[in-house]
Amino acid sequence: MSEPRFVHLRVHSDYSMIDGLAKTGPLVKKAASLGMPALAITDFTNLCGLVKFYGAGHGAGIKPIVGADFNVHNELLGDELTHLTVLAANNTGYQNLTLLISKAYQRGYGAAGPIIERDWLVELKEGLILLSGGRMGDVGRCLLRGNQALVEECVAFYEAHFPDRYFLELIRTGRQDEETYLHAAVELAEARGLPVVATNDVRFLESDDFDAHEIRVAIHDGFTLDDPKRPRNYSPQQYMRSEEEMCELFSDIPEALENTVEIAKRCNVTVRLGEYFLPQFPTGDMTTEDYLVKKAKEGLEERLAFLFPDEEERKKRRPEYDERLDIELQVINQMGFPGYFLIVMEFIQWSKDNGVPVGPGRGSGAGSLVAYALKITDLDPLEFDLLFERFLNPERVSMPDFDVDFCMEKRDQVIEHVADMYGRDAVSQIITFGTMAAKAVIRDVGRVLGHPYGFVDRISKLVPPDPGMTLAKAFEAEPQLPEIYEADEEVRALIDMARKLEGVTRNAGKHAGGVVIAPTKITDFAPLYCDEEGKHPVTQFDKSDVEYAGLVKFDFLGLRTLTIINWALEMINKRRAKNGEPPLDIAAIPLDDKKSFDMLQRSETTAVFQLESRGMKDLIKRLQPDCFEDMIALVALFRPGPLQSGMVDNFIDRKHGREELSYPDVQWQHESLKPVLEPTYGIILYQEQVMQIAQVLSGYTLGGADMLRRAMGKKKPEEMAKQRSVFEEGAKKNGIDGELAMKIFDLVEKFAGYGFNKSHSAAYALVSYQTLWLKAHYPAEFMAAVMTADMDNTEKVVGLVDECWRMGLKILPPDINSGLYHFHVNDEGEIVYGIGAIKGVGEGPIEAIIDARNQGGYFRELFDLCARTDTKKLNRRVLEKLIMSGAFDRLGPHRAALMNSLGDALKAADQHAKAEAIGQTDMFGVLAEEPEQIEQSYASCQPWPEQVVLDGERETLGLYLTGHPINQYLKEIERYVGGVRLKDMHPTERGKVTTAAGLVIAARVMVTKRGNRIGICTLDDRSGRLEVMLFTDALDKYQQLLEKDRILIVSGQVSFDDFSGGLKMTAREVMDIDEAREKYARGLAISLTDRQIDDQLLNRLRQSLEPHRSGTIPVHLYYQRADARARLRFGATWRVSPSDRLLNDLRGLIGSEQVELEFD
């Protein structure tokens, strides 16, 4: 093989985030296809792709060179930033490069992102090779300006600190000033004896990727492509050129090519991957292994005392627990993981001791008895047949991995504790990368290409919003996408470009739960990435790479449900303390509570963890779970595999006796499998059951059985053939017929693909059960906690308020005196609306109000509140929102008076503050002591009409709390529906039609699997609700009426809804209230007395009627005198459309009782 002549030493991948298009894998693959012996990836101030690059490089026979590009501040050049490429020559250089990158982030960003000071290179110079940055480097900038003195100063610095390790970088990519700089640099090199090196400053794989790269950069920088102000810093020539192309390009400077190979030879970094380094856990004089044994045995004693309070029972059950504990401890210690268990034990115990709610454990870790004994998990693995080997397999060495759920509010306290315990330099969270996803990339590309918003929005909306959606999947799921792609060239160009950018790394963030704890400093293992202020460090390696690099990951996950349970318990235990009852321990509630299972079987699971979706409610209704094992099964069954395979139907039929029980199949079963499969009615539902079947039938160890389970999941033919023979041979040794064994093996293999981790299912089922139990026994406290957790999502709060009303719970409007930021329950058991859920108020103003209330007691009225709170925090807009929401209802006569008095109250408060500032007591100070007098200072005005009050509630709370818009229509609606309210509806006889009316509270159009469209809307008349279905013809005709907050009158057939257990209507005819009036009303009656009539009133009456004269309803004026009553019929040209606007105008003018519609 001939000696290489060129190596690429400056290449950006998409991890550069500001530019760079290709991922590390394709870059390595391209270099390999070009026959390159080595490659450097030098992303901008990061090594995010290093682990992947290192593995891919060695896999492809390419030497990976570790490096990074930097923005450098050199005080000689003022505030100007220059470029520099830094390569690691050896492991010391790699360590120094890591520190250089970390330091750049830790000091905070400049306008151009993270920056290094040139002087930092002095302390971290060992093992580093520098490329000058070409025309954008400090020497390059000085050369182009002809500032020889500065050139000399810059070069002297590098000669002094980096002799033979500083190279003048030469680039020929057709960009401005490159050749001018290149000739000056070559002259400088000859004059000073400096080496030169050629790079192509690579940003993409092929030349025709240039346009996609320009768009990628424009997306980051916020420009459109044709914006004349857009910087044009790149050229189509910055692709990965071949050795031949580079040799031709630099044929006049062969030394620049030779030096690329020499540098590649000098760069020899070994990155240690695949080893684990745990921090040392303090164990005093004991070894870590002995300390673990001691703590586990002590913990088991406590657990057994709780599980079996009866001493005889405990004595009887102890041996199986002792045996299992000894086996697990032996495996943990042999595999070298005692420290891991102790570290997790410590921070979980600290959390519990410091009031941080912790989940019962999730994932396969719940299968460990040692974890249960150490109180890492809260499920007895023996009771629920959970297997340790599913978590830690002695036959397959891999790190244990506990996923620990913490209360969202307090999770950061635990991370702070860990940082305090092991050292802040040793603890970090983990980076995660955002990529250009299907929907967003269409919007981004469309914007950069300059397309109108509507055009881009139409295409983007065709991409389903499902997680993990890709453009390829979207083209399969949405038939309109391929249609418009083929029909419209602009659409095709946009989507083709979006495909090139889809999946490209866009930004970096913080992983939801991953935390690493290093035995020394984090930077000994990975560089750090920080936010713009240099805070919140995360490792630059993602969660899989950071483990491969040797750091052990701990998952500190935030689970909202734990926060809900904690809030509910705080309210419950406050009430119990008042009643002299002991606090409720949620971990000690019985798992067989009848009230809870009755509620579950009725599918009343809104707000219950994991069980609140429509599909899950349907499954619950069919399954009718009546024990905790059924709840574990629910979590495992509600997944696409079991639902689509028919497994769910078999499970339900077997539970209810409609299908014969067999273990696992009527034709092929064995009695020894009954104990394994009995909890799931003979269905192979869990991965643990797959392992137990292999153990029972064929004598597998549980470690070996776990390997079998994995092999079945991967479906590798050669591995499966090997496992089949092992399974058959083992079964024969156990005296089981070989054919039967193979048939059962086939069944196990079939179901293994659907099998779920029972440990995870059981742990989540426990949290589900706890929320179910709280909803059944403490409904007000539980629902108040749930609404608090969803305060920022008004739509969710609206649904939860509906659920409260369905449950018969009373919800009071927010109250400035008794209310809190959160929803809470008062002494009467009523839920008081959280002030924090009022839209447009914010936390600062609420804190100011509550502080003032805590200091001076309840507010007496609006003037008192304004005087006692900081009006800088509590401005007029916020006060208006509070009045509209009802929060001030107890402070004044009515909301209109409060609103009209607001200006005076704020003015008085301002005067009061000024007087206090100069130490005076003014008239307001006296008035504040006399509420009766203040009452008189409210503006004199009429109360708002009910609709205005309700609109204010809707605007600020997202719902109607003290009334309902339909109230004003009830009398009228009775005419259309024959007096039948929704709660009184019954299924209609075949062919018969009935009429229903109500306010639309939800409306949507969905597409069935067959591609048919169905409209669904929910009507509410305050007495009840009805779901209305509109199929194809009806939907085409009436879809424009399916709008939230519209009053609809619907005729159709009513039938039972198997899903909800209620009723549903299939619509034939739909009208809104205006159409219904036009159809059914016979006149508009206006009643006036002789005392009311004058020219002014008649003129205003004419003005009110004028805009509505294009209708069909005659107007009748009833004139009332003491001695007579007359009816005047307006002429045909005065027929009107009786809209809400007209009726409200007339009622405001004459009076509500004097305007009404007439019917036959």
From Swiss-Prot:
GO-annotated molecular function: 3'-5' exonuclease activity; DNA-directed DNA polymerase activity; nucleic acid binding
InterPro entries to which the protein is assigned, alphabetical: DNA_pol3_alpha_NTPase_dom, DNA_pol3_alpha_thumb_dom, DNA_pol3_finger, DNA_pol_IIIA_C, DnaE2/DnaE/PolC, DNAPol_HHH, NA-bd_OB-fold, NA-bd_OB_tRNA
Cellular-component GO terms for this entry: cytoplasm
The keyword Cytoplasm is assigned to this record: yes
Keyword annotations: Cytoplasm, DNA replication, DNA-directed DNA polymerase, Nucleotidyltransferase, Transferase
Enzyme class: transferase
Reactions catalysed according to its record: DNA(n) + a 2'-deoxyribonucleoside 5'-triphosphate = DNA(n+1) + diphosphate
Domain of life: Bacteria
Family per similarity comment: Belongs to the DNA polymerase type-C family. DnaE subfamily.
The name this protein goes by in its record: DNA polymerase III subunit alpha
